[in-house]
Amino acid sequence: MNKEEMNARQKKIRNFSIIAHIDHGKSTLADRILEQTGALTHREMKNQLLDSMDLERERGITIKLNAVQLKYKAKDGETYIFHLIDTPGHVDFTYEVSRSLAACEGAILVVDAAQGIEAQTLANVYLALDNDLEILPVINKIDLPAADPERVREEIEDVIGLDASDAVLASAKSGIGIEDILEQIVEKVPEPSGDVNKPLKALIFDSVFDAYRGVIANIRIMDGVVKAGDRIKMMSNGKEFEVTEVGVFSPKATPRDELLVGDVGYLTAAIKNVGDTRVGDTITLANNPAEEALDGYRKLNPMVYCGLYPIDSSKYNDLRDALEKLELNDSALQFEAETSQALGFGFRCGFLGLLHMEIIQERIEREFNIDLITTAPSVIYHVNLTDGSNIVVDNPAEMPEPGVIESVEEPYVKATVMVPNDYVGAVMELAQNKRGNFITMEYLDDIRVSIVYEIPLSEIVYDFFDQLKSSTKGYASFDYELIGYKASKLVKMDILLNAEKVDALSFIVHRDFAYERGKIIVEKLKELIPRQQFEVPIQAAIATKIVSRSTIKALRKNVLAKCYGGDVSRKRKLLEKQKEGKKRMKQIGSVEVPQEAFMAILKMDESK
């Protein structure tokens, strides 16, 4: 292909993604676009085609990214090359969204005609604006009885400040308005900039591990050309590989001779480790490298930690294999081996957020058939010690004794909640209970309000989202971003069973809430732990001070049953003998803690 042909081809490329809040119809719209452009025959079509994981289909969310090349013959008679890059919509995967948006020049903003703008729609729109994308608003689900497209149009203009006068009214489900969307992409989304003669610069926006070909990196070519046989270099770590294949997804992987400027496709190079192809990194040629990498790359650090233990301890090695396999596709997942006196051998795992944690747990249980016990999630605390040193604690059991702690800092997030104004009071009460500081509140229209709070991340990781949904009858939508660390009065609470600490039940709590949390958890454990042959005291303690206690009464056999009348001294002798036996049992007896007891720590707020 000569230079003129390359330039002409570049002018026909349109790279775009679809951004939307969960359930506003993003995956359905992607399905319709694939159908309309003839990428798939009707026979191959299935709903949520780009959501390839079962879990994605069931939960109706997109977790992994997918990129598809489509050909579209526009009304002007020209054939255009579309690259549709699917993005996850959930707050845990914000970084992945920002990188996949960086691979585009335009974004279709899908807003539900009945529900209007939600918190995550806004969060993703701001990401798109940061990447200077052309945003095309689409008001979806106009065939719903509750649809009010005019109100939503005003909302888009007032809340986001986009001109929505020519927003497409569509229904992805019934296929209304799809052609208008495709025409708008041709007219409004800019062609890719970039120079085919410059050294190669390719942005990695996703990578997947394949057992036979190694890592398959999804890339967008910003400058230059890449073809099989090229020696490439990763700019963040300097590692070099030889390209074995390049190609595009249409939607099946289709090998090509080369990928040119503006193309979105994949590349394989016998890379063994997904950690070498980190999302956001820049690929260049080893013998003719680019001078500087593309902006915006950062290493992802986990925000939430929890312990995963196999219920059957013989499956420990299987769990390690499962985590290693998941890590191949998920460079944000971190894990290290740990042991607990109560739970045996397991792993301490780090996740991007709560959804990420749930998905990993569910995939281990489903795909690898391992039943898990999970400990309460915790965040990373910065602890300043009295000798002037600092340590980082991600496991409550590792928190030092109070005597050596100068201060403890915990991560705070800025939480944005969008909610109908009938529920403002409920949301504010919930945020206050979670130690939130009120920042701002604004009315988006007559019905909906946006409320912003600063809340400690540790309060959100328990069950903030569930409580928010139940206190607003499911109408609230929620988004958060990390803003930094602040000092707090935090203490570690230990739970003692039969005077022995159970390390897996320790948790970190604010001093002001310590007494009531201790009381709740002791009562809950009393209900959940089965009665033993001897009585079991349950205590909640901060350092050496016991703040709450309860006792599980012993089961006892009626040793007097055989006495009938009998002398009182005979009865007393039998009772004394039983008492002796119970005492001896208590000294050597151990208490089995059921899985529900660990979950009780997570759910303790609900009984307040």
Curated annotation (Swiss-Prot):
Entry EC no(s): 3.6.5.n1
Domain tr-type G: residue ranges: 11-193
Keywords: Cell membrane, GTP-binding, Hydrolase, Membrane, Nucleotide-binding, Protein biosynthesis
Binding of GTP, residues: 23-28, 140-143
Bilayer disposition of the protein: Peripheral membrane protein
InterPro entries tied to this protein: EF-4, EFG_III/V, EFG_V-like, EFTu-like_2, G_TR_CS, LepA_C_sf, LepA_CTD, LepA_IV
Domain of life: Bacteria
Top-rank EC class of the record's enzyme: hydrolase
Matches recorded under SMART domains: EFG_C
Function: Required for accurate and efficient protein synthesis under certain stress conditions. May act as a fidelity factor of the translation reaction, by catalyzing a one-codon backward translocation of tRNAs on improperly translocated ribosomes. Back-translocation proceeds from a post-translocation (POST) complex to a pre-translocation (PRE) complex, thus giving elongation factor G a second chance to translocate the tRNAs correctly. Binds to ribosomes in a GTP-dependent manner.
Family indicated by similarity: Belongs to the TRAFAC class translation factor GTPase superfamily. Classic translation factor GTPase family. LepA subfamily.
Xref: NCBIfam families: lepA, small_GTP
Name listed for the protein in its UniProt record: Elongation factor 4
UniProt organism field: Listeria monocytogenes serovar 1/2a (strain ATCC BAA-679 / EGD-e)
Gene that this polypeptide is encoded by: lepA
